[in-house]
Amino acid sequence: RMGFPFVTTAHWVFDTSGILRYLTNWGQRTVAVSEDIKEYLIREYGLPPEHISVTINGIDTEKFSPAVSGELVIREFGLDTSRPILSYVSRMDADRALVARQLIQIAPELDRAIPGIQLLIAGGGNVFDELKALANQTNQRLGRNCITMTGPRTDINEIVAAGDLFVGVSRAALEAMSAAKPVIVAGNEGYHGLFGPDKLTEAQAGNFCCRGLPVSRPETLLADVSAAFSLTWEERERLGAYGRQVIFDHYSVRRMASDCLTMYEQVRRRKYRVVMSGYYGFSNAGDDAILESIQQAIHEASDEVAVTVLSNDPDLTRRQYGLDAIPRFRMWRV
């Protein structure tokens, strides 16, 4: 319709109230980054399931690697590597910074439970100034620089590497896993806790965004951070190594690129364009079987052929066969 192939990528869920859903065009195909986003697109926008491909957030395992020392960040902010360091990365916006606020809130209790702990909180946004003021007040009460608010950064791999434990959600959590850090997965949409083998399936279902999980609470966060730092060095190493292997197995950049290329291939312009006319879209088993057979034969013969079906029910034909279809009596569309 627009004269060019159009593929979108869905990374989040959006407000669909009023006329908003009708103002959105998801293109000929959509790449979703998780199964729950795919279900959301089907439910809220009525997209055909066969037009949605699920991929992953691909992580650069060389950039986010145990080989990155974090030394530059440690020197910049005067962190003490002989004391525990917790790193956190997120946008400091009202709808994203709940866990950052909770970390600042529980800092005095963390200091009692884990003497000398340092919180390295990175990110900028519309509540950054407010949170920085709270952090400064907490530091004054503790009589030391317990909380470091870095503001917006581009060297996130260095921020992650500087910490012994990472707290965060979504892509930031995956990047920390790639760096072989133990990770507490927590964000505005929910709380997952210290990631390990027992939590993989649930975490993957929501793309590590915690959608549908219990809300993050300061007391739960305090307990899990304390428990994580009470683990032996070997136990934390094992958790970090497991997280990095999960990235290699399920979240590689190569996998993400392959998924996108496959979807782009589905919509690229073909050299030959074929229009099929018949008794299609009437839910007639015999004619539908013929259509399926012809379509399969064309596909096997050449990937340079684009097929458009003249159908009594174009939506039904698209859903059943993934083929482009137009109303059979609107000849000007041909």
Indicate residue ranges for each PLM-predicted region.
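A conserved, positively charged/aromatic
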Residues: 4-35, 46, 160
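Acidic anion/phosphate-binding donor-loop and adjacent secondary structure
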Residues: 19, 42-43, 59-76, 94-98
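Carbohydrate-associated surface elements
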Residues: 36, 58
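Conserved donor-binding/catalytic core segment of Leloir-type glycosyltransferases
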Residues: 73, 79-100, 104-108, 120, ...
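Nucleotide-activated donor-binding/catalytic signature segment of Leloir-type glycosyltransferases, i.e.
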Residues: 131-153
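Acidic donor-binding loop of glycosyltransferase active sites
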Residues: 158-174, 180-184, 189
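A short, well-ordered alpha-helix in the C-terminal region of glycosyltransferases
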Residues: 227, 234-250
